[in-house]
Amino acid sequence: KVQDLLLLDVTPLSLGLETAGGVMTVLIPRNTTIPTKKEQVFSTYSDKEPGVLIQVFEGERTRTRDNNLLGKFELSGIPPAPRDVPQITVCFDIDANWCLNVSAEDKTTGQKNKITITNDKGRLSKEDIEKMVQEVEKYKAEDEEVKKKVDTKNALENYAYSMRNTITDDKITSKLPTEDKKKIEDTVDGAISRLDGNQLPEVEEFEDKMKELESLCNPIIAKMYQGVLAQMVLVLLIMADAPTGSGGAGPKIGEVD
């Protein structure tokens, strides 16, 4: 008896795009059955960034430079905003004919752009694919170290910029002593300056800088919020102790619109 067999096409390599630190963020993992469609939301890397470059890669390595570039396009017209604020939806859509459509859309404006990548242009050969898959284990330790460095760097960067945005908020700076604000500014500027360097230091250096930032900033910010909370509690206590006006008296003048 001959049994019916269902043959499924799968992606030979992972598909993704380049994100901060030159690493590949995978949207469609290797061996995913096609057709398939995946979406993920990304944001900008710098303040007031007017556009982003979407670079599409296939491969299994952590760094995009070790993978194969399939194509790229720009999404422009993003309104000026602090980093991490814009919401950009990226969609990878592979049809049954191996045609890969990659689109990006800014949620705020509806601005969008896309690229279509066919299976016969710029793709790796069967031999190259097999070689790349075999290299995954060979470079596993190296790739894990790179990813750890980039993740630690990104965490420090996010915290530093978050603190910078915090101390430039007028609602917050009005409650922050000038001396404390200056301390945070100097430490944050020093961290960002180090991050902007071309070198990728060891993980320990990023972790030490993060501890330095947190040990300085967290107590100052916590103290400020405690002061604000104390003021709110005081106001509530005063309101609770105030006469309620019960006893038949009508509304006082000025209380009626």
UniProtKB/Swiss-Prot annotation:
Keywords: ATP-binding, Nucleotide-binding, Stress response. One of its GO terms (molecular function) is ATP-dependent protein folding chaperone. Disulfide bonds: none annotated. InterPro entries: HSP70_C_sf, HSP70_peptide-bd_sf, Hsp_70_fam. The keyword Nucleotide-binding applies. The keyword Ion transport does not apply. It comes from the Eukaryota. Belongs to the heat shock protein 70 family. This is Heat shock 70 kDa protein.
